[in-house]
Amino acid sequence: MKMPLNIGLVHFIGIGGIGMSGIAEVLHNLGYHVQGSDQSDSANVQRLREKGIEVFVGHKAENIGDAEVVVVSTAIKKNNPELVAAREKLLPIVRRAEMLAELMRFRHAVAIGGTHGKTTTTSMVAALLDAGHLDPTVINGGIINAYGTNARMGDGDWMVVEADESDGTFLKLPADIAVVTNIDPEHLDHYGNFENVRAAFAQFVENVPFYGFGVMCLDHPEVQALVSRIEDRRIVTYGQNPQADVRFVNHRMDGAASLFDVVIRSRKGEATEIKDLRLPMPGQHNVSNATAAIAVAHELGISADDIRRGLGSFGGVKRRFTHTGTWNGVEIFDDYGHHPVEIRAVLKAAREATKGRVVAIVQPHRYTRLASLFDEFAACFNDADTVIVTPVYTAGEDPIEGVNSEALVSRIKTAGHRDARYASGPEALAPLVASIAEPGDFVVCLGAGNITQWAYALPKELAEQGKK
């Protein structure tokens, strides 16, 4: 049974969140009556209002109004006044992933999972299905530049969604195709240990129906180990690994664009080659993500020409190596990377894309993450000539003794880096960058906090610095 249209007013608590806003937008486009609230105004809130969705700023019991159903994300606390009011009214409380699962029942669905690369890969799958005239509905965890939004309502039979593994609810998603980009020990506060993370991803793939399949990265040791344990579902492997079913080869750079070929081999021995693919993004990690999208597209019957065209015009995702400006020949970028694996991949891509130097500005995100991955953070900046570390973005966490940005700078140095520095805040960045950066250099701002605002302000601040 699909969700009926007469379920009444649906109220989203935290509607401005990147995951919640996309679901609300698609529900609204399907004809459901949607409203919501968020603790602050934002671009997502404004976009929803422009589409005719009522959004309250601030959380109050009366915001519930005549709602018949309430949707919450894991970020909503149990004492939230709207959640308390909804429970008092005995309204159904629906988790974000459960509502996403209901939407997926309207379409055939591709779900993209993995510790890193989900948002970009989701966007790439959407772009290739779009190029193949399948007109997909898309719900992503980031703003897709081609759409200007994280959600898109298509008229086709397919839906492409990002599957967030952070709280285990991705196992509710009824996907026909499950993509796994990589598996790393993240979200242990929920899972307890890495073995439970592994088990969750195994279940994610095994949840696809017998006529579906998994698409899994053979370059990642944990994913390859998982492939060997999946016994009763069809798997399509991808990567640079010579054993991959869909393998990228001949990867080279053309400025900030990646050029590569793909070889597709069936288990019956047939081989297909797609040559001269161009992805307007640097980095082997992005080529790997593109190869995952190609694997999905090929299985769905999309032609090589459409794949080539879809990749060539791929516009990227906001906060994924996003260019924010130029100052004195210095290119400035903003990136969401906040885990050592992500940071290493982004800086490697920057190194490949420029003949100049790479300056990394990082805002560590959460004391708990910094504490649990301290040694990994100390060793992930090798491709940056200079590392500038700013204060930790707490995300509401209490400090942990001995775990701070100054300590990280010290550890980066003792791990062998030649130039790591501490900056006390955004006001210190422009003078510091102006004294370091030269024409041809890349400055990459990294983090999941408010460093994105600094990245967009930096070009102007550097220009002002030059006038002093």
UniProtKB/Swiss-Prot annotation:
Q: Can you name this protein?
A: UDP-N-acetylmuramate--L-alanine ligase
Q: What is one Gene Ontology biological process annotated in the Swiss-Prot or TrEMBL record?
A: cell division
What pathway is this protein a component of? Answer: Cell wall biogenesis; peptidoglycan biosynthesis
State where ATP binds: 114-120
Catalyzes what? Answer: UDP-N-acetyl-alpha-D-muramate + L-alanine + ATP = UDP-N-acetyl-alpha-D-muramoyl-L-alanine + ADP + phosphate + H(+)
Q: Enumerate the GO terms in the molecular function aspect.
A: ATP binding; UDP-N-acetylmuramate-L-alanine ligase activity
Q: By which gene is this protein encoded?
A: murC
Decide whether keyword Plastid is in the record: no
Q: What is the lineage of its organism?
A: Bacteria, Pseudomonadati, Pseudomonadota, Alphaproteobacteria, Hyphomicrobiales
Q: What is the role of this chain?
A: Cell wall formation.
What GO cellular component entries does it have? cytoplasm
Cross-referenced HAMAP family: MurC
EC number(s) stated in the UniProt entry for this protein: 6.3.2.8
To which protein family does this belong?
Belongs to the MurCDEF family.
State the compartments where it is located. Cytoplasm
Question: Keywords for this entry?
Answer: ATP-binding, Cell cycle, Cell division, Cell shape, Cell wall biogenesis/degradation, Cytoplasm, Ligase, Nucleotide-binding, Peptidoglycan synthesis
Family matches, as NCBIfam families: murC
